[in-house]
A protein has these predicted regions:
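NAD-dependent ADP-ribosyltransferases
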Residues: 1-218
Length: 218
């Protein structure tokens, strides 16, 4: 997980979600994250090392970002859920995920933790450095977490408990269009939010959905 907060803070406090909203579709769109209602119960992490570099590159290349980013390596356990079983559960109950949302889920390799990632699950922090000339991100200095407790690494294979089954309209689904890095993977807002994490919120790039809207409203 990529975050702009320094290791001493994260190693002390761990990561916490914005709130208690278990609507997974809102989380995947970013509607319940920093750019939206800021009440998501889910903490987004990724199994993809490449994705952490992509996330860091997006924010380092932004003229509005002037901080340092860290990649936090986290040991998953029973509080971590792969989103696919829950997405399948929602799909079976009539919830529609757009092609765009499917792409985001596939590209981001997202694993979510519910409400809190304790310090003892956080292995280390690695400073991510940015070369503006080559637009490349690389690993810098690493810091181990003295509070980390070793153990087995696994992901809960079940559906997320108390998952909200939303009633989704076509008009609501329009909000799904945006940056390929969803708002929950964006750095902005709540600076308390991990596998790999981030924080500091910037507006996603505008996606021109007019052609798609014409098809939706035929």
């Amino acid at each position: 997980r990529v975050d702009s907060r320094p290791p001493d803070e994260i190693f002390r406090d761990g990561f916490r979600s914005h709130g208690t909203n278990r609507n997974l579709q809102q989380h995947l769109r970013g509607d319940s994250c920093a750019a939206g209602s800021r009440d998501s119960a889910f903490i987004a992490t990724t199994t993809s090392l490449i994705e952490t570099y992509n996330i860091a590159r997006q924010y380092y290349s932004s003229s509005g970002f002037h901080g340092t980013l860290y990649r936090y390596r986290i040991r998953a356990n029973n509080i971590f859920h792969s989103i696919r079983p829950s997405v399948n559960y929602l799909t079976q109950r009539g919830v529609t995920f757009t092609g765009f949302e499917q792409i985001m889920m596939r590209e981001q390799n997202e694993i979510v933790a519910i409400e809190h990632i304790p310090s003892e699950n956080i292995v280390e922090a690695v400073e991510l450095t940015y070369d503006r000339f080559n637009s490349s991100v690389s690993d810098g200095r690493g810091t181990s977490n003295a509070r980390y407790v070793p153990g087995s690494t696994f992901v809960n294979p079940g559906v997320i408990p108390d998952l909200v089954v939303p009633a989704v309209s076509v008009r609501e689904r329009i909000n799904a269009f945006g940056s390929l890095i969803s708002a929950c993977f964006a750095l902005k807002g709540v600076r308390r939010d991990g596998l790999n994490k981030r924080s500091t919120y910037y507006e996603p790039e505008f996606y021109d959905a007019r052609a798609v809207l014409k098809e939706l409203f035929k």
